[in-house]
């Protein structure tokens, strides 16, 4: 099925989902190693079989990743390579998803109750707003289809809602700083202890200076994952979740807490 979709001159949103599912064999949300090489090989075979030239985007993609063992792409990168239907592709090209800081601000707008999740109706409004900002409108049926596909693409634990880290897969891999923090998340007890330690004045939130101290210590302890030279970027992106410069426990937990275990 993936081969026939790769032969198409225009790939629908549903076909794109099937292609992604086919190649993301381990369900990690990214294509890397053998998965990525399989995609490149099947793409080349499918286009040749259909008598179609590689598009400029495909050529660039093959040149960039064809000979690399360490390549890694997300859904966003694949959406830019394949000839995906215009309105669906716009969801991956909007300005709000060009940088992690803008993404965090957008998340704050929709996660109004600080629950750490965006549910189906909120996601639908989020996608609708993105399309409207690109001067595109879709009917309710198509919007529902896009919402359903986004949940299928990003909802890795199948709970019908998206966590921040799941939603962040809308960002290009190079922009997704949250990936850096995946390996250093703390259990709930450790996180609460750390929050109370760095909330030095005990006012229930962490300000920019307190966050700076926390990040410096994290960088020192996790040199393989975090680069101390990037502290200002980490801080700017995390503070985009704050409420007027106040970073509450639930907000910081989205970045640093792995849950209650």
Curated annotation (Swiss-Prot):
Gene3D superfamilies in alphabetical order: EF-hand
Domain EF-hand: 11-46, 53-88, 98-133, 142-177, 186-221
Single GO molecular function: calcium ion binding
InterPro entries named in the record: Calbindin_Ca-bind (IPR051001), Calbindin_six-EFh_dom (IPR029634), EF-hand-dom_pair (IPR011992), EF_Hand_1_Ca_BS (IPR018247), EF_hand_dom (IPR002048)
Positions bound to Ca(2+) 1: 24, 26, 28, 30, 35
Entry keyword annotation includes Calcium: yes
Residues the record lists as binding Ca(2+) 2: 111, 113, 115, 122
Residues the record lists as N-acetylalanine modifications: 2
Residue ranges, annotated region (Interaction with RANBP9): 2-7
Keyword Acetylation in annotation: yes
Positions contributing to Ca(2+) 3 binding: 155, 157, 159, 161, 166
Sorted UniProt keywords: Acetylation, Calcium, Metal-binding, Repeat, Vitamin D
Cellular component GO terms held in the UniProt record: axon; calyx of Held; cuticular plate; cytoplasm; cytosol; dendrite; GABA-ergic synapse; glutamatergic synapse
Residues binding Ca(2+) 4, per UniProt: 199, 201, 203, 205, 210
GO biological process, one term: short-term memory
Quaternary state and interactors: Interacts with RANBP9.
Record remark on domains: This protein has four functional calcium-binding sites; potential sites II and VI have lost affinity for calcium.
Function description: Buffers cytosolic calcium. May stimulate a membrane Ca(2+)-ATPase and a 3',5'-cyclic nucleotide phosphodiesterase.
UniProt record similarity statement: Belongs to the calbindin family.
UniProt-recorded name of the protein: Calbindin
Protein's gene: Calb1
